[in-house]
């Protein structure tokens, strides 16, 4: 038996599945594309998470695009973090060209240019569906971790949240929380209420928390707090039997790692709380793709990394897969990397001693192969080629295969401004979430109370300046526009006691919210 025959005989059975799958590409041996070797990815194991890695310019983004398209073909929705701003073309039909024709002549696979259903989303002023969350939804523990508070300050934050809950002071955005902290620090009535009901708290501690909030605001955090909240079930949509590709445009968030980590962790928590337990399904409900994943872990405190690791473990049982896209596997903490079942490794470049160490570490993450010398081949993989290893339907790692990857069927370029406008204007979710809702919250209530105490009804503060609460001008995330925050929270509590208990143990338990007046 020749080497080629042996390669076909040993590899093909391991990538043959009984259930639903998609073909990611064809095997390559000694530089030759082998059409007989299909590299198939079982849909059943998509929720086992994954990694797409490789040096700049090796084709990671196109692989991500093709992967998402294949999921869409099978009615699976996805949420894609688009940090470089080059994935909007998924909404437009691709075009055949000579390079694509050559690729598909070699693979013997059909190629059908087509567009896919897309929703554009944003955390900022970018056009698209606005994603927001209320401060109450984050809760005191998660918010404290984001702010980098110590244990004592975290306890104080929990007391402040309890005070707001008891006094009917809804915390919608950071201006609400800042106003409460100022009230219980500087106002005699506020100080007395806090001391009588919850114990005396040093003004210096409250001031330290306030300064941490201001620091977070400087990273742009005001834009992710507010109303109306986004319902994560709106991510699980299909159109014409294709899964919707939800593209979150976060081009302007690259230099704000704390804000990025905050959003990712809160998103995972909300998905976990909202979706029912599902186990291993024939195909997942949702796949989340995090481009430039190193930004999540960059300078993140240890406790925040632990929370992300925990959520990656837990969310799989909800039928959700998480995929990290980055340059080298070493960008991902070992505790997270060990949980990633699907691995797609594009070329790495060994220009420096550090690069060579990263290559050595990367190769150690993959199964050994008698057909490839991975440490050498990984540096010479062509564009549109990658090492692939996945999990079969039994959860067993498949052999490492040098893979000639499929091309995206949608446009491999961005949408024009006019095309983006048309896409946004046609979106039902934009109409649902982009209306301004400015309900009465802690800021207004306390401001009115202080004005009444002063006996000055003409005080200029009675009308809150628009610029003082910019988040009120933007929609919010993770909380249905229907009903008050209190109703939603208790509803989730009744429906998901098990989820609530688990989230409480890891510090992400939802807190009850005061009703709006």
Segment roles from a protein language model:
Residues 2, 66-68, 91-109, 310-396:
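Conserved ATP-driven motor cores of ASCE-family P-loop NTPases powering translocation/secretion/packaging/pilus
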Residues 1-55, 62-74, 78-109, 113, ...:
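Basic- and hydrophobic-enriched, low-structure N-terminal and domain-boundary segments
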Residues 68-77, 85-310, 336, 379-381, ...:
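P-loop NTPase motor domains
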Residues 26, 43-45, 54, 122-125, ...:
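Flexible glycine-/small-residue-rich
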Residues 52, 78-81, 122, 248, ...:
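Structural recognition of the conserved hydrophobic beta-strand(s) that form the central parallel beta-sheet
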Residues 1-14, 130-136, 344, 377-483:
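Conserved P-loop NTPase motor module
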Residues 459-517:
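Long amphipathic alpha-helical segments used for membrane anchoring, targeting, substrate engagement
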